[in-house]
């Protein structure tokens, strides 16, 4: 295992000053892309994801459409300037293609695609700053963008990450913990339905540690959900005030 440049955990405190069960600062804005049908920006600390939704609209070419449900397409992409490392190529990497598929499969259970036969819904996600947990921040942003677009949904999907750092379960991995920790578990969760839609286990986990991690992920997701719900509510309250002058 690679040695981290700084200790990841000392006396129960993480390198960035958080306790094991603390999220980084969560910031959420809705309606940030003016030409999209729905959009959202989600920041977990220094990780920021922007999602834009276009649709539902007619599928082209038509032979790819489905008669009884819509098709959702998801593209996850990291901006060339998003990391402190070398500028990445703008061409989608194998990792980005794989994460795009994972995010689509996590979002589909939340969306009532049967309401949109012969249609498509396109979801574009751009990571503009990366410091760990990019796929789960993307999941939250994409879910909010779908809701902002008025897409029929069973529930919002909230993404959080948990991991193992020096044998301790921690919430919301930053970049150092992501790179040097002993394991990570990205989680997608629908808080109202109490249903997991994404679990990707990496590393060796004992059963009791895995269950502890799941419980911590649920608590983190419920915390983020409240912020996400407030962001949606605030947007539409401000629209109502503009229309009705209240």
Curated annotation (Swiss-Prot):
Its EC number is 3.1.13.-. It is found in: Cytoplasm. GO terms for biological process: gene expression; rRNA catabolic process. The keyword Glycoprotein does not apply. GO terms for cellular component: cytoplasmic exosome (RNase complex). InterPro entries: ExoRNase_PH_dom1, ExoRNase_PH_dom2, ExoRNase_PH_dom2_sf, PNPase/RNase_PH_dom_sf, Ribosomal_Su5_D2-typ_SF, RNase_PH, Rrp41. Keywords: Cytoplasm, Exonuclease, Exosome, Hydrolase, Nuclease. Its main location: cytoplasm. GO terms for molecular function: 3'-5'-RNA exonuclease activity; RNA binding. It holds the Pfam family RNase_PH. Component of the archaeal exosome complex. Forms a hexameric ring-like arrangement composed of 3 Rrp41-Rrp42 heterodimers. The hexameric ring associates with a trimer of Rrp4 and/or Csl4 subunits. Belongs to the RNase PH family. Rrp41 subfamily. Catalytic component of the exosome, which is a complex involved in RNA degradation. Has 3'->5' exoribonuclease activity. Can also synthesize heteromeric RNA-tails. This is Exosome complex component Rrp41. The gene is rrp41.
